[in-house]
From Swiss-Prot:
It is found in: Cytoplasm; Inflammasome. Coiled coil: none annotated. Keywords: ATP-binding, Cytoplasm, Immunity, Inflammasome, Inflammatory response, Innate immunity, Leucine-rich repeat, Nucleotide-binding, Repeat. The gene is NLRP9. It comes from the Eukaryota. Its main location: cytoplasm. Sensor component of NLRP9 inflammasomes. Inflammasomes are supramolecular complexes that assemble in the cytosol in response to pathogens, such as rotavirus, and play critical roles in innate immunity and inflammation. The core of NLRP9 inflammasomes consists of a signal sensor component (NLRP9), an adapter (ASC/PYCARD), which recruits an effector pro-inflammatory caspase (CASP1). Within the complex, NLRP9 and PYCARD interact via their respective DAPIN/pyrin domains. This is NACHT, LRR and PYD domains-containing protein 9. LRR repeats lie at residues 743-763, 772-793, 800-820, 829-850, 857-877, 886-907. Residues 146-465 form the NACHT domain. GO terms for cellular component: canonical inflammasome complex; cytoplasm. Pfam families: LRR_6, NACHT, NLRC4_HD2, NOD2_WH, PYRIN.
């Protein structure tokens, strides 16, 4: 093949591109020995006066076929004409590419046999022209993008587009000058491959007549990998785990895929990947700088054109289109090309049978049930019900087995094992439920396989022999709503939908044989069981549970299930989520806590008033549950955006007298510029906690809030304003609240730049006789030692303040000395003092030790993250041994202490009768130091109950010593990070 190509190709065109001096130099090089090729030179007598035409003939004469080209290309480089070398290489590749021809034949067949367009190709190209342009532009040199992701839900056309671009490349109509080799990898076909190499994987489709496949890797920038089928991938891919750059080495399949996706293997190559909803969650984060192309489906005009092409006859197409358009939910579903095909197929067969133009479209389950009954009726009329039932059950068993085992292409053996003959397989192909895949079979679409898998549970009987590969109803419910999302999630959602009396009745009427009536009861029992186990209850994915409940459209069933749960977390990211959440939440009667994230709903930038008003309708419906549910107490919203109208609806509901809300938590919430929130706080007498952590507040917002808090009707006791961008300028407003609101007991201002100026204002209020604050959290507030004199005055004056958090402020030794002077005063009532990360040294410990001896009220002292060293710890331990010391908790985590002071710590553990908790976390103690501590812990006089220590950070022998002590002392717990959760909760970072 190579010889015929070179003889036809012709050198003359390239020689004519040489300038006079370049051509002369070219001839001079030809007269020299060609040692690299082990060829003799062409005699100078023949070359000297030879024209370009003559030289072309001489090259062909002396170096026949491919040799002439190898010599010519080598000489082009020597005369600095790399442009000609590059162009010739590219043309040679294009001509010498049997692989491209092989792919053209393969994908032409796939396009004709396996793609369900039912429309002219020019219509398809017109609907996808924007995506085509994006794909073409994505891989240009200017774009510098090597990874492109096609994103869209199932049925939107991702696979169809990938097949089309593969065919277009093979035909030379796309990326002609960009990619020499394009490989189409259907990753679900790799489920059965344990170990291979990339070279071996690609060799499966490599024509024997082509060049060595190894040669293609010399220019990886000319390679594109098209990857599809991630939804059906059986194994999980890991981020940066055991990646490899060796395309020759055999290794586990997940490593090869992970290495390609993360650009460890062939980093200069390009990727084109299709990801649906599930695969986006599992794999998108692994990609490096991907360009995202979203497939949006059909517009209204494209839907109309699709109907026209599908039905052919214009009057019939228009009649069906108008019918579907008048059916709102059904028309919305038809933006998805596959769903549109389902609808058209259902309607067409009904019309052909002379039936009414009717299709139930309450939800997706109804649509698939209608499709199944329509095609089943068309192909099974000549068989008795018993035979039809057996055949349908066998088909659904095949689908279920495939989903549970991640099998999507079925051999004749697979069919036989599930009770299907080859002729029955052909029958299902005729009904458009299966399709041919070479000598095997596959379902027409993954969604159809998922629906048929759900139908298996409606068709199976208790006496049937179990298939060990297919999970039970209980296992499917758990897989749907507890485990991470898999294909079983959608099967479970379909199972919810087909369990309803209405759908069971519809299916029985159409099929002509009875179906299980117990499915819904079994689902209910499974969910009740999950709700009663704390671990399962906390792991429930309410997003999926709500979708399943919504599919039933049975209010009584939804109410019964939702009454199993008192706490729900739900994410609302689009209008569909909002519709489903509003439907389910309004049927919750026992719900006490709702944790909710609302994104991409409000504000609405679409410009469509009707769509926006529709969102507000469903939002109002959702918020109504705060009024109707008498048990509701906690609303926790995080990472949420609300505009003024949506906030007004929420606040109106929360302000109703019948709303029993006790805690309102807004974490990182944007709520516009309306003060409705604060009015709701004022008018709800049950509300005791308000948290706005991470929510940016303007000075105006703070002033509105403070006016609310000063009102006699306000009942707020805990106020969390951490990380709210509060500066010293508004501290006067906050101070005015402290001075007059005797109900406020807890205030967190962590992570705000209050500075010393703001602290001075707060301290004046804290000294006020009406101030009843008990806990004040001021971590990361940009305070210095300057504030300590004012704080000291508060410690002397305040009779209510029991916990003061000054962590992560630069108080330094001199600042703490001022605090200690106040702490030693008998009138000081503080019980907990947090001084972590306050830039303290051992110099401060003398003053602190004196406090421990004389202040019997101080129970907790946290000094972690300070450079107090062994010297400082010794002073503290001496104080702990004093009989007047009543300290119960001491925090020293990450303090740079060594074995040298462990004897002092041990002595303190034995002598101090009140010390219950000691935190030594993140301290690099050696084995000898641990032995000393363990001996003290084992002493009968040691009263310690909690030791903060990172056990797994020690060697195996030391870990055994620590575990042995824990086992020997029942009241002792040794744990890592023992106070973190409690500290976060008190500060309001996590509630």
């Amino acid at each position: 093949m190579a010889e015929s190509f070179f003889s036809d190709f012709g050198l003359l065109w390239y020689l004519k591109e040489l300038r006079k001096e370049e051509f002369w130099k070219f001839k001079e090089l030809l007269k020299q020995p060609l040692e690299k090729f082990e060829l003799k030179p062409i005699p100078w007598a023949e070359l000297k006066k030879a024209s370009k035409e003559d030289v072309a003939k001489l090259l062909d004469k002396h170096y026949p076929g491919k040799q002439a080209w190898e010599v010519t290309l080598n000489l082009f480089l020597q005369i600095n004409r790399k442009d000609l070398w590059t162009k010739a290489q590219e043309e040679m590749r294009n001509k010498l590419n049997p692989y491209r021809k092989h792919m053209k034949e393969t994908f032409q067949l796939i396009w004709e046999k396996e793609t369900c367009l039912h429309v002219p190709e020019h219509f398809y190209k017109e609907t996808m022209k924007n995506e085509y342009k994006e794909l073409n532009d994505a891989y240009t040199a200017a774009a510098r993008r090597h990874t492109v992701v096609l994103e869209g839900p199932d049925g939107i056309g991702k696979t169809t587009l990938l097949r089309k671009v593969m065919l277009d490349w093979a035909e030379g109509n796309l990326w002609k000058d960009r990619f020499t080799f394009v490989f189409f990898l259907n990753v679900c076909e790799m489920n059965g491959i344990a170990e291979t190499s990339l070279l071996e994987l690609l060799s499966r489709d490599w024509p024997e007549s082509s060049e060595k496949i190894e040669d293609i890797f010399s220019q990886p920038e000319r390679i594109l990998f098209i990857m599809d089928g991630f939804e059906q991938l059986k194994f999980n891919l890991q981020l940066k785990a055991d990646l490899s750059d060796d395309w020759r080495q055999r290794q586990p399949m997940p490593i090869i895929l992970s290495s390609l996706l993360q650009k460890k293997m062939l980093p200069e190559s390009s990727l084109l990947i299709a990801l649906g909803k599930l695969a986006m969650q599992k794999h998108y984060f692994m990609l490096r700088h991907p360009k995202l192309i979203k497939l949006l489906g059909f517009s209204e005009s494209e839907k109309k054109s699709y109907f026209s092409y599908f039905f052919g006859e214009k009057s019939k197409a228009l009649k069906v289109f108008n019918f579907v358009r008048d059916n709102g939910p059904l028309f919305i579903l038809c933006h998805n090309p596959f769903t549109c095909w389902l609808v058209c197929t259902c309607v067409k067969q009904r019309l052909e049978r002379g039936e009414d133009l009717e299709i139930n479209s309450q939800n997706t389950t109804y649509l698939y049930a209608s499709f199944l009954t329509t095609v089943f009726k068309a192909g099974s009329q000549s068989f008795p019900p018993k035979v039809n039932r057996a055949r349908l059950k066998s088909l659904c068993a095949l689908a279920a087995e495939g989903i549970w085992t991640y099998t999507f292409v079925f051999s004749h053996g697979d069919l036989r094992r599930n009770g299907l003959s080859e002729s029955e397989g052909v029958m299902w192909v005729g009904m458009r439920l299966l399709q041919r895949r070479g000598d095997c079979f596959a379902f027409m679409h993954l969604c159809i396989q998922e629906f048929c898998a759900a139908m298996f549970y409606l068709l199976k009987r208790p006496k049937d022999d179990p298939n060990p590969a297919i999970g039970s109803i209980t296992q499917l419910v758990r897989a749907s709503v507890v485990q991470p999302q898999t294909l079983l999630t959608q099967v479970g959602i379909f199972m919810f939908g087909i369990s309803t009396e209405e759908i069971v009745s519809m299916l029985e009427t159409s099929f002509g044989f009875p179906l299980s009536k117990d499915l819904k009861q079994e689902i209910t029992q499974c969910l009740e069981s999950l709700s009663q186990c704390e671990a399962d209850r906390e792991a429930i994915a309410f997003q999926e549970l709500f979708i399943g409940l919504f599919e039933t459209q049975e209010k009584e069933f939804v109410t019964k299930v939702m009454n199993f749960f008192e706490e729900v977390f739900i994410y609302i990211g689009n209008i569909e989520h909002l519709v489903i959440a509003s439907f389910c939440l309004k049927h919750c009667q026992h719900l006490t806590t709702l944790r909710m994230c609302v994104e991409n709903i409000f504000p609405d930038d679409s410009g469509c008033i009707s769509d926006y008003n529709e969102k507000l309708v469903y939002w109002r419906e959702l918020c109504s549950m705060f009024i109707t549910n008498k048990n509701f107490q906690i609303l926790d919203m995080e990472n949420t955006s609300l505009d003024d109208p949506s906030l007004a609806i929420l606040c109106k509901a929360l302000a109703q007298p019948v709303c029993k809300l006790r805690k309102l938590i807004f974490t990182s919430v944007y709520f516009g510029h309306d003060s409705e929130l604060f009015k709701a706080v004022l008018h709800n007498p049950h509300l005791k906690l308000l948290s706005l952590y991470g929510t940016s507040l303007s000075q105006s917002d703070i002033r509105h809030l403070c006016e609310t808090l000063k009102h006699p009707m306000c009942k707020i006791e805990e106020l969390i304003l951490g990380k709210c961008d509060i500066s010293s300028e508004v501290c006067e407003d906050i101070a005015s609240v402290l001075a007059c609101n005797s109900k406020l007991k807890h205030l967190s201002l962590v992570e705000n730049p209050l500075r010393d100026e703001g602290m001075t204002l707060l301290c004046e209020a804290l000294k006020h006789s009406h101030c009843a604050l008990e806990r004040l959290m001021l971590m990361y507030c940009c305070l210095t030692s300057v504030s300590c004199d004012s704080i000291s005055e508060v410690l002397l004056c305040s009779k209510s303040l029991s916990l003061l958090d000054l962590g992560s402020n630069a108080l330094e030794d001199n600042g703490v000395a001022s605090l200690c002077a106040a702490l030693k005063h008998p009138g000081c009532s503080i019980r907990e003092l947090w001084l972590m990360g306050c830039f303290l040294t051992s110099d401060s410990c003398k003053d602190i030790a004196a406090v421990l001896i004389c202040n019997g009220k101080l129970k907790t002292l946290k000094l972690g993250h300070n450079e107090i060293g062994d010297t400082g710890v010794r002073q503290l331990c001496a104080a702990l041994q004093h009989p007047h010391c009543k300290l119960e908790c001491l925090g020293l985590q990450t303090c740079p202490i060594t074995r040298a002071c462990c004897d002092d710590i041990a002595a303190a553990l034995i002598a101090c009768k009140t010390l219950r908790s000691l935190n030594l976390d993140w301290i690099a103690l050696d084995a000898d130091a641990v032995v000393v501590l363990c001996e003290a812990l084992s002493h009968p006089d040691c009263a310690l109950q909690m030791l903060g220590l990172h056990k797994s950070g020690f060697d195996e022998e030391t870990q055994k010593i620590l575990m042995s002590v824990e086992e020997k002392i029942p009241h002792l717990t040794i744990s890592h990070g023992p106070w973190i959760d409690e500290e976060y909760k008190i500060r309001g970072v996590l509630l």
